[in-house]
UniProtKB/Swiss-Prot annotation:
Site description Cleavage, residues in chain: 126-127, 148-149, 367-368, 392-393, 472-473, 562-563, 1193-1194
Gene designation: gag-pol
Zinc finger (Integrase-type): 1199-1240
EC assignment: 3.4.23.-, 2.7.7.49, 2.7.7.7, 3.1.26.13
Location of the RNase H type-1 domain: 999-1119
Full protein name: Gag-Pol polyprotein
Chain intervals with Low complexity compositional bias: 130-147
DNA-binding residues: 1419-1465
Function: Matrix protein p16 forms the outer shell of the core of the virus, lining the inner surface of the viral membrane.
Presence of the UniProt keyword Zinc in the record: yes
Post-translational modification: Specific enzymatic cleavages by the viral protease yield mature proteins. The protease is released by autocatalytic cleavage. The polyprotein is cleaved during and after budding, this process is termed maturation.
Binding site for Zn(2+): 1208, 1212, 1236, 1239
């Protein structure tokens, strides 16, 4: 029916025959809205039929409206309106409501007659069913059984199943009293074991009294049916949904055509739904939700109430209070009329006595029979049901339809059994009284069991009693300010009206609001004078506030909340959106502020800076600085790329130095594969994020800057920042701290929404249909704090976020192209490498062609020429970045595998999901010379950590090679921290090197290297042949150079034995696979051409053959560098000069140190160039001079030192004589004299006080600073200082300090002055007991305490520096000790603490060597030669790891342990046992 036609017909129907009021479309809409409120779907549209409206009327009539807010007149009005609507749709033309009701009664009568006729036909077909129907009105089972077990057969005729009849009887008995409860579900599982789908449906519909339970079961089964249909689309092999539910088939067809699996699936669906309904019904209610039923005996109600109160965790006084009041307030109307005159303080016995006759007729009769039995009177009343109309109606009433809770709107329970209870302490949902933390007990003024509607239950478009309550801390005026207040026992929605004095409600609320009627008052308004009714002492509650007010009732179109209520609940009114305030965070500084002068700017930049400052000043981001602000930071402007607009920057380097820095909250970018899949995705960019957060008032003066005009046209303008400035070190930390709190609040309000934050970029994802509303809500929340999120910064579905391109299901890198510029500066190359590193998970190409160009480059503006390999590397990057591949996100439960591939200059890895890569990268190999296994394990640990960060779970690994090679390589690894689960794939990956253990029958090369000054010598020895090379370098480079020389000269299979652990470990771990630099790179290039290289190690200087010869060769090479000879023949004409590169490297060497041969008329001058001695030869003679190749033409003074030493030991000459006679430097001559012991004894100079020094020799003394006594001790070798504040200068305090010193450090010798506290017997005895040498200096000679005296001065300087930052002397002393012992002060070198640790390490090594020498015993052995003959016994010179060196026939030989058998040393004193 069309809307206009329906409206015309409604206006012709009178509400009552006596009045001229007619129905309108608004009355119908009101009735439909109330029907929807009760959970019944009712839609008034053009396609609505009379049958649908009749079904709605039947459902509404079956509802339990006992405690609902719509009962009485409103219930009758709703039914009458719906019946009028039905009569119009049915084709009738009612004149009034009574006429429509008559049409409805006639219709229902015809329906009952038709149903009775149909039942009669079925009974005539099955006479056996009539046997149990004669007492239908006496038993409720037969009353509730409306659906008979008539099953349609395959040919269409009904059949009777006697077993089904028994099952129906069992089900009817099980659901008679409590409906579908847990007991009934158990019975249902038994009786439906062999039933088909149609029979199960018939069984459920046979209990019309509990039709709501059946409807709930059917709705849950339909949900499972819909879910199965969706699942069936992706699983075609599964049974059809129609086969499971038996749709379109008779019972016989279901029993024959449908499989047992389908029937069992439907049966399980029904049982699961019934169990959910039963569990939802039988939740234990709290005392607040217990109400007495209309026919329930008062005794039963009190028993339930007491049982609930006993289960509460509350004080006894609270339980007594609730029992007194709830026993009256929650009683039914009959009991309340009796109990209210008695009052709440009446004893419970009197209440029970007064209400004993209240209840159903059955309970009254039972009470009367029990009373008569106690009196001994035989009851003349038969034990049958009373025949009163009320009792008969209560026992034989028709089937009850489903029940619905008007509190939460859900079916299956009533309001008194609702699970959504509230705490009776504070009135808030979500917890019980036992867990309540609120101290507000005044809310008991209002009925706390009144439910407060929530946004999840109702929507704003529903009735006024169902709108969500508005609970802000303020009231916004951008829309009508409606709020809800609990007044007089009901939630009332009203309009905030600051012009009204009182609360004015509609007249409809007069009967609903609890209060005392008062005197009516006159209201004067726009429409004139109006008389309003009044109620006083009306209790109200809003949030946590309560009170008592007067309420007026008049003919007002909307409820109004006036100032009598608003003054207690409203804090402020505002129309602005930005209402939240951001509290600035305090910032600490150390030292004075920056005072850097402003440098001059060009006129163009000055004008641009003026415009920017003007805009910032107008926006309030900066303000004028005070006249007495002495701080200043330079400011400048640059042009933005692309737009050409000017941008202001500040040089905050000085301010950043004095600012106490905070910790940034962001630990890095989120990994895009770890972002969860969702249906909707949105990215938001916050504009001017830093400029939104205020800067602390106390810190703003430190950010001052100046705008200096051109040519000093006028005074400078001074400004300071009011918000976070760009470039300041603490701006990111303060921004992250502030926004974190806002984001956390958003996440709490939307826990199912995915929200990522990285600086000012937000990523929002969800699976909700109202995703856009959530995004808008988040934007509004950010906007309330002042953060701007412009529309042009919002991206949806396919977003570009922090360098990635994301869709709800996929991700990839944003397409880009790297510019190839040749040549380019170091700075530009660094930026290019950084861009390549960013996209390496996509490209997975090693960057060594680019990074090798950056070695030893310190000048950022230096030009670099790209190599062809570098250009090719960048081109490969551009090829893959032109259109990056889309990748999947990580799914929950999916197996993650990391595949590792070895490349010459790195390790390539891929994170696989279902065999597809979703992340990857390259781990470059550094130059730490570590072995491959360590590097791979370290890489696996890093990758596992990355996957844990990305997904929260660990991954397995897929490695190249075989498990046998991997396990064999792991056995050589000594320090394994963690072994991950690994799998292997076939790949030519070699875990072991060409280098291995020493093998016999191979040529063996002994290598050694040494260093003297800056000159290094490398030597190898093999079977009497020696080769050496001198070059500038280190000890390690010399050792490696010797190995490189041996590899170049050696055969394809050879052995190399070295005494360097560094070289041995590096060679053993396959150096050819590592991209090392220098000599390692040379070795790596040579090794692939070798078949096998055996590497061994022997200790140095142990007299081992081969190693001794190599060591002597090193010494000889270093000594031979002193005589100077030309590399090529030289011919000098008279007066000719010629330059000569000697190839001699020695630190401190000078040309004057060399002496030419006496027979050569050559003048020699020169200098040191890059530590190399370069000479200039001048022929001062008259003839040609020819110097042959390798001919020594001058010698160094070093060769004269032994002769000078020997001469001095014989004649004890003075240093001056040694200088003139042997041409030595005076410093060396004095050293020769100083080392002579005879000259020391015969000296006649007076002995002054000495200043003893040495390892673990401590000097101690006391000093005073600011009236404080400080005990100081200094370790003379390292300068390590230990100090402690002591209360007085006594021997006891010094002894305690010495004990603490010994506890921390090694003390072998203590030296002090002759003070009484240091020479006391207590100190002497303590040192003697501890085994410490105790000495004292010469009296009154401060030189004997020079070290500790200098420490006094340094310590006091540091104490004065730290005094202002510390509250106590002890704290300043701790800082001073850390500064003296562990800080280098910018001068480099070792700290005193590091020098002391080296001394400790040396002491430990000496102890180990002494212990080893004591435990060393003489070893002898037998050896097996190539002919497998045993020879011996031979003495073992050295026993190593896997091999030993023996003395064989006067020569040394190396044998592996497998060819040796050790025996006890032979002893000539042991006699033969046979004698």
């Amino acid at each position: 029916m069309k809307r206009r036609e329906l409206e015309k017909k409604l206006r012709k129907v009178r509400v009552t025959p006596q009045q001229d009021k007619y129905y309108t479309i608004g009355n119908l809409q009101w009735a439909i809205r109330m029907i929807n409120l009760m959970g019944i779907k009712c839609v008034c549209d053009e396609e609505c039929s009379a049958a649908e409206v009749a079904l709605i009327i039947t459902q509404f009539s079956a509802l339990d409206l006992e405690n609902s807010p719509i009962r009485g007149k409103e219930e009758v009005a709703i039914k009458n309106t719906l019946k009028v609507f039905w009569s119009l749709l049915a084709g009738y033309k009612p004149e009034s409501t009574e006429t429509a009701l008559g049409y409805w009664e006639a219709f229902t009568y015809r329906e009952r007659e038709a149903r009775a006729d149909k039942e009669g036909e079925i009974k005539s077909i099955y006479p056996s069913l009539t046997q149990n129907t004669q007492n239908k009105k006496q038993t409720s089972n037969q009353t509730n059984t409306q659906s008979l077990p008539a099953i349609t057969t395959q040919d269409g005729t009904p059949r009777f199943d006697p077993d089904l009849m028994k099952q129906l009887k069992i089900w009817s008995d099980a659901t008679e009293r409590n409906g579908v409860d847990l007991h009934a579900v158990n019975i249902l599982g038994v009786i439906t074991a062999n039933l088909v789908q149609e029979e199960i449906k018939l069984l459920l519909n046979s209990t019309p009294k509990w039709r709501l339970d059946v409807q709930l079961i059917e709705s849950k089964v339909r949900e499972k049916e819909n879910a199965h249909r969706t699942w069936k689309q992706h699983h075609p092999e599964a049974p059809k949904t129609d086969e499971i539910i038996g749709k379109g088939l008779s019972s016989a067809e279901q029993a024959t055509l449908i499989s047992v699996e389908c029937r069992e699936t439907f049966r399980q669906w029904v049982l699961q739904a019934a169990m959910e309904v039963a569990q939802a019904k039988h939740a234990t209610p709290g005392p607040i939700n217990i109400h007495q039923g209309p026919k329930e005996p008062y005794t039963d109600f009190i028993n339930r109430l007491v049982a609930a109160l006993e289960g509460m965790a509350a004080p006894e006084t609270t339980k007594e209070y609730l029992l007194q009041h709830l026993s009256i307030d929650h009683a039914n109307e009959d009991c309340q009329s009796i109990l209210r005159p008695l009052g709440p303080n009446t004893p419970m016995e009197k209440k029970l006595e007064a209400c004993r006759v209240v209840g159903s007729q059955k309970s009254k009769m039972q009470f009367l029979v029990a009373a008569m039995k106690e009196m001994g009177i035989q009851s003349p009343i038969p034990a049958v049901l009373p025949h009163t109309p009320e009792a008969y109606a209560s026992q034989t009433s028709g089937p009850e339809d489903g029940r619905r809770c008007y509190g939460c709107g859900k079916t299956g329970h009533l309001k008194r059994n609702c699970k959504q209870q509230k705490c009776y302490h504070c009135g808030k949902p979500g917890h019980q009284a036992r867990n309540c933390r609120s101290k507000n007990r005044e809310v008991l003024l209002c009925p706390l069991w009144a439910e407060e509607p929530t946004t999840e239950q109702f929507s704003p478009e529903q009735h006024e009693f169902c709108d969500p309550i508005c609970t802000p801390s303020y009231i916004r005026l951008d829309k009508q300010p409606f709020i809800k207040v609990f007044i007089g026992g009901r939630w009332v929605k009203g309009l905030v009206d600051t012009g009204a004095d009182e609360v004015v409600l509609k007249n409809i609320h007069w009967d609903r609001i609890k209060g005392y009627p008062g005197t009516p008052i006159k209201q004067i308004g726009v429409n004139g004078v109006n008389v309003a009714k009044r109620k006083t002492h009306v209790e109200w509650r809003f949030k946590d506030k309560t009170g008592i007010i007067d309420v007026l009732f008049s003919d007002t179109p909307v409820n109004l909340f006036g100032r009598s209520l608003l003054r207690s609940i409203v804090t402020c009114f505002t129309l602005l959106v930005h209402t939240e305030k951001i509290e600035p965070l305090p910032v600490k500084v150390r030292g004075p502020g920056p005072k850097v002068p402003q440098w001059p700017l060009t006129k163009e930049k000055y004008q641009a800076l003026k415009e920017i400052v003007k805009d910032l000043l107008a926006e309030g981001k900066i303000s004028e600085a005070a006249w007495d602000n002495p701080y200043n930071t330079p400011v400048f402007v640059i042009k933005k790329k692309g737009t050409g607009r000017w941008r202001m920057l500040m040089d905050f380097r000085e301010l950043n130095k004095i600012t106490v820095k905070g910790q940034e909250f962001s630990t890095g970018l989120p990994y895009p594969p770890g972002i969860k899949e969702c249906e909707h995705l949105t990215a938001i960019d916050i504009k001017d994020a830093y400029f939104t957060i205020p800067l602390h008032e106390d810190f703003r003066p430190f950010t001052a800057f100046s705008v200096v005009p051109v040519n000093r046209e006028g005074p400078i303008e001074r400004f300071q920042w009011n918000v976070l400035p760009q470039g300041w070190v603490c701006s990111p930390a303060i921004y992250q701290t502030t926004t974190q709190k806002i984001i956390e609040n958003i996440k709490k309000s939307h826990p199912d929404v995915m929200l990522y934050q990285y600086m000012d970029d937000l990523l929002i994802g969800s699976n909700r249909d109202d995703h856009k509303q959530i995004v808008q809500e988040i934007r509004d929340k950010l906007g309330s704090y002042g953060f701007k999120t412009p529309d042009e910064k919002v991206q949806e579905e396919r977003v570009k976020w922090i360098g990635f391109e994301l869709t709800p299901k996929k991700w990839r890198f944003q397409p880009r192209q790297l510019k190839i510029k040749n040549p380019l500066t170091v700075n530009e190359l660094q930026q290019l490498v950084g861009n390549c590193v960013w996209v390496q998970p996509e490209v997975k190409i090693p960057l060594y062609p680019l990074t090798d160009l950056l070695r030893d480059k310190t000048n950022l503006q230096e030009k670099i020429q790209l190599t062809p390999e570098a250009i090719k590397c960048v081109e490969e990057f551009n090829l893959k970045l032109k259109d990056p591949e889309w990748k999947d996100r990580i799914r929950e439960g999916a197996e993650l595998v990391i595949k590792i591939q070895m490349v010459p200059r790195g390790i390539v890895f891929d994170l696989l999901q279902d065999g597809n890569p979703i992340w990857g990268g390259v781990k470059g190999l550094n130059y730490d010379h570590s072995n491959k296994i360590k590097k791979i394990l370290r890489t696996m640990n890093e990758l596992n950590r990355t996957v844990v960060i990305m997904t929260g779970r660990e991954a397995s690994f897929l490695l190249p090679g075989s498990s046998e090679d991997w396990e064999a390589a792991l056995q050589k690894e000594e320090s394994l921290t963690q072994i991950f689960p690994v799998k292997f794939y076939r790949h030519s990956c070699r875990w072991t090197s060409i280098c291995g253990p020493v093998r016999e029958n191979l040529t063996t090369y002994y290598t050694d290297g040494g260093k003297k000054g800056k000159t290094a010598a490398a030597v190898y020895w093999c079977e009497g042949r020696t080769k050496s090379k001198v070059f500038p370098g280190t000890n390690q480079q010399a050792e490696l150079k010797a190995i490189c020389m041996a590899l170049l000269d050696g055969p394809p299979k050879m052995n190399i034995i070295t005494d360097s652990r560094y070289a041995y470990e590096g060679m053993r771990e396959e150096p050819e696979t590592w991209a090392r630099e220098g000599i390692w790179l040379e070795i790596a290039k040579i090794l692939p051409f070798k078949q096998y290289v055996g590497v061994g190690w022997v200790p140095a200087h142990k007299g081992i053959g081969g190693n001794t010869e190599a060591d002597e060769g090193v010494k000889k090479a270093l000594e031979q560098m002193a005589p100077c000879s030309p590399p090529e023949a030289i011919l000098l004409k008279p007066g000719e000069k010629q330059n000569l590169e000697t190839g001699i490297y020695m630190q401190g060497l000078r040309p004057q140190s060399f002496l030419p041969r006496a027979d050569l008329p050559v003048a020699i001058t020169g200098t040191m160039v890059d530590s190399e001695l370069q000479l200039q030869l001048l022929n001062i003679g008259t003839e040609h001079i020819r110097i042959q190749k390798d001919e020594v033409f001058m010698t160094c003074f070093l060769e004269n030192i032994p002769s000078a030493t020997e001469d001095h030991e014989r004649w004890h000459t003075s240093p001056d004589i040694l200088v003139r006679q042997f041409h030595l430097p005076k410093r060396i001559a004095k050293e020769i004299v100083a080392r002579c012991q005879e000259c020391k004894r015969t000296t006649t100079s007076p002995v002054r006080g000495t200043n003893p020094r040495g390892r673990f020799l401590w000097q101690m003394d006391n000093t005073h600073w600011n009236k404080t006594i400080i005990w100081v001790a200094v370790e003379t070798n390292s300068g390590l200082v230990e100090a402690q504040v002591i209360p007085e200068e006594t021997a006891l305090q010094v002894a305690l300090c010495i004990l603490q010193l010994i506890q921390r450090y090694t003390v072998l010798h203590l030296h002090s002055d002759n003070g009484p506290c240091f020479t006391a017997h207590r100190i002497e005895n303590l040192c003697k007991y501890l085994g410490i040498t105790k000495t004292t200096g010469i009296p009154y000679n401060p030189q004997s305490q020079g070290v500790v005296e200098r420490a006094h001065r340094d310590l006091k300087d540091r104490l004065a520096a730290y005094q202002g930052d510390c509250e106590t002397v002890e704290a300043a002393l701790s800082l001073a000790l850390v500064s003296l012992n562990k800080k280098r002060g910018g001068i480099g070198g070792h700290t005193p603490y590091e020098i002391y640790l080296e001394s400790e390490h040396t002491k430990y090594q000496d102890q180990l060597e002494q212990q080893f020498s004591k435990q060393k015993i003489e070893k002898w052995c037998y050896v097996r030669n190539r002919r497998k003959e045993w020879k011996g016994p031979y003495k073992v010179l050295w026993d190593g790891d896997g091999a030993a060196v023996i003395e064989e026939e006067g020569k040394t030989a190396l044998y592996p342990h497998r060819h040796m058998r050790f025996i006890p040393p032979p002893d000539s004193d042991i006699q033969d046992g046979s004698s």
